[in-house]
Amino acid sequence: MTVYLDTCSIQRPFDDQSQLRVAMESEAVLRVIQLVEQGDLDLFTSETPRIEPGQNPHSRRRRFAFGVLALATRVVETDSQIESRARQYGDMGLRPFDALHLSSAVEAEADVFCTTDDRLLRRGSETETERTRVPTPVTLIKEIESRTLRLNHLTSSTTKPSSC
């Protein structure tokens, strides 16, 4: 499965963890990163998230973001197709960086564009994103765990018990 994390998702572990939603999303993002490190997920990125963290005044956040982005198996270069799609997304109400993120993920044919931004989640679900789904990190981890459980169940039910 290919995943594109936007900057909001990558930075979630540094947000105020006193809110349950933020804490859950942070844990989910860290789990996604762990799955990428294990080779169970492929991380796609683009030039856009490489620009945004550089603008962050907090060095710890910058280092973390660049470390996550370094795990990407594919870096999507912005081209005229991505810019055109981003303009269309902008016309639908997405902010410029959000439109570039989503456009890059769609053009790269990522399975999932993961974000914690409510506005982007809402607009992304209302927008034509072809095969790319737009879930929260928590939803993504639930889907992965559910799929893993189903696969484990199928594997165990097809294994015949040995007769001794």
Placement of each model-derived feature along the sequence:
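PIN/NYN-family metal-dependent endoribonuclease catalytic core
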Residues: 3-57, 70, 74-75, 138-142
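Acidic, PIN/NYN-like endoribonuclease modules and their adjacent C-terminal/linker elements
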Residues: 2, 17-26, 91-92, 106-164
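Short beta-strand scaffold positions
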Residues: 77, 96-99, 115
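Helix-adjacent hinge/juxtasegments
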Residues: 62-87
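Short, basic, glycine/proline-bearing loop/turn elements
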Residues: 14-18, 81-90
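Alpha-helix capping/helix-boundary segments
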Residues: 9, 49, 82, 100-101, ...
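Short, aromatic/basic amphipathic alpha-helical patches
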Residues: 59-67, 123-129
